[in-house]
């Protein structure tokens, strides 16, 4: 099974507002950059979309280390999601899970792979995370012009 590193980031101008996401896939010496945007969204939705699209780009089952600077995504996928599913996608406060559509898509993609999750400090020393931030911000800016 291939070992892949997936680095993700999301950006939003306004929150809500125009947003962008990006993902970098690393396999051995290969590197692939992905990015996209939405006209009206939130930062959390873009963080989730980055992880979904990065995982979706993998055509076969892989061992994936997902690197994110989003504590929301990290805690959601590693800590909260099992409880949400048990409770019919309701939070501990008995309210519907925000961004449920994307959490379901992320769960679907994660289950295709052997995934581990790593948090990295944003805007710091992780070169690929900084590149993801640059791509996501650029995508959000381009979306805001259209």
UniProtKB/Swiss-Prot annotation:
GO biological processes: DNA replication, removal of RNA primer
Residues reported to bind Mg(2+) 2: 9, 133
Chemical reaction(s) catalysed: Endonucleolytic cleavage to 5'-phosphomonoester
Pfam families: RNase_H (PF00075)
TM stretches of this protein: none
Name of the protein in question: Ribonuclease H
Record note on quaternary structure: Monomer.
Species this chain originates from: Solibacter usitatus (strain Ellin6076)
Keyword flag Transport: no
A GO cellular component entry from the record: cytoplasm
Keyword Nuclease annotated: yes
Name of the gene this protein is made from: rnhA
